[in-house]
Amino acid sequence: MDSTEDRETPLKDQIRRLTNENVQLQDRNERLYAKLGELQDKMGKLAGSKTDLSSKLVLSEEEKLKISKELIELQIETNKIREHYEAETFELKNTILTLENRLMSLELQKEKLAGEHESVKERLQAVDANRKELADEYIVLKSNYLALSKEHEKEVAKNDELSMELLNLASRRGQDETYSQSRALVNEATAELDRVKAMVNRLSARNIKPEDLVATEYERQKLERNLLGNQDHIREEIENMKKIHETQQQRLEERIIAMGKELQEAKRAIRNTQHKMAEQSAVLLTSQSQLQETEAQNSHLQLQLKELNEEYRSRLNRYIQDLADYVDGTARSKGDGTRMKHFVDNMLSDIKASHRSREEQLAGAARQYKKRMQNLIKKHQSLLIAYRMQREQLLASGNQDVEPGPPEHHFTITDPELQSQVGLELNRLREDKARLETQIHDLKEKKRLSDAGTSNQHVEHGGKLQEESWAEIRKQLREFTHNTQEELERERSQLLSRALVAEEQVAELQDYVDKHLARYKQEILRLRKLLGNEEQRAVSADAPQSLLIRALRRNSHEM
């Protein structure tokens, strides 16, 4: 009995030890099952959070793509509206300039016809004055002729009476009284001779010769015929000039009425275009407000995406560290406790290195862009200097046929972010210089107009100076139209270049959107596949350790 009891005691001790070890193993197994349940819960939560994050990322990417497409469409519409508006303004400016040129030409023709009318009026007044003077002279000559004819008739009657008296005396007296008769006749003849001499002296005092008395009647008739003929000819010329003036005045009035109608139509078209421009500006303002709202939403979504990425990265790092600790804890009994920890550390260092390289790449691109902008600004400054020197040379030469161009202030960069303090000060000095040049040009124009006014006063006294002034005015009008056409052509070329640049930008953005859209679609499909695989792994509780390590390695490469 003692021997059997001695044999049973070590067996009982061994059974007790085995039961204790079994209890310890059961406790350890329960703890491991609890840890496994916790890890499965964590993996389920990780898969759920990953699906949520992936869905949020997909939605945010889709929203970003939609917003970018809408922005591109808005930019295209605004560019089209701007091009249409600029084309309409260009056409309206051309029509206004042509109408103004036609109106100025009509005004010049009207002024010319008014000057001709004034000259014809002055000539008519001079002809009327000459006619009145000739009529007065004719009346004076006629009165003198009548007085002389009356005196001549009286003298003829007296001579007849004397001759009759002499004949009577000769018939009544005889030959014996010849001496007394001859003496009386001599006395009468001397008296008659004295009377004739007195009459001749009186006629010579009036500057009329006796032999001219016979031709006065013929000259009077000839003068009357000439005066009447000149009056008829002058009257015909006056009637013809009146008819020509009336026809020209009627033509000018018709052309002015037509020009007024065209001007009203142009004003109506301008009002319509202004109304359209107001509507388009309202649409543009609304689109700009929508663009600002979308930009704000985009920035907000980008911030949310950045926060989610950071949260996802931190949670992934924490989960990887937990998994590494768990794997190291389970593998510590096998003598390989630092392998998983080392792998996870290497993976995190690779992720940090990739982020650091991306940041360095972006910083290098920003530096390169800044360097390119500085080079462009330097080239622009050198071009401005060359343009200023060439313009000053043209202004110093004094050649009026060559247009020196606008001041250099029109070609300066107005963006303050691209300019330094020295550049801003130079721009301010260029503005002051341009303002002073415009003031000098205005003063020269005023002086030229005053000189032209004084010259116009002198032109009224001479036709040659008037023609020169008209030629100068036509030359100035041609220069004005030429300058306006050059400005419009320059503006048109600038608009075309801007349109080409905008088209290139739209094409680049479209290519960028297409490429990234395809890449995002591929990434979304890949993430969905990965999410499906991760869910299957989370459901299977007896997954081997090699598959877990491969999944972690794949996730590290994806990050």
UniProtKB/Swiss-Prot annotation:
Q: What induces it?
A: Highly up-regulated in the ciliated epithelia of embryonic skin during the developmental window of centriole biogenesis. Expression is probably activated by mcidas/mcin.
Where found? Cytoplasm, Cytoskeleton, Microtubule organizing center, Centrosome, Centriole
Q: Look up the record and report any one GO term of the cellular component aspect.
A: centriole
Region Disordered, as annotated, extends over 1-20
Q: Which residues form a coiled coil?
A: 9-327, 419-541
Q: In which tissues is it expressed?
A: Restricted to multiciliated cells.
Query: Where does this protein have compositionally biased stretches of type Basic and acidic residues?
Result: 1-19
Name the predominant localization: cytoplasm
In terms of Pfam families, this protein maps to: DUF4472 (PF14739)
Report any one BP term from Gene Ontology: de novo centriole assembly involved in multi-ciliated epithelial cell differentiation
Q: Which UniProt keywords apply?
A: Cilium biogenesis/degradation, Coiled coil, Cytoplasm, Cytoskeleton
Q: Which family does it belong to?
A: Belongs to the CCDC78 family.
Summary of the function given for this chain in its UniProt record: Component of the deuterosome, a structure that promotes de novo centriole amplification in multiciliated cells that can generate more than 100 centrioles. Deuterosome-mediated centriole amplification occurs in terminally differentiated multiciliated cells (G1/0) and not in S phase. Essential for centriole amplification and is required for cep152 localization to the deuterosome.
Name used for this protein in its record: Coiled-coil domain-containing protein 78
Look up and give the organism this protein is from: Xenopus laevis (African clawed frog)
What's the encoding gene here?
A: ccdc78
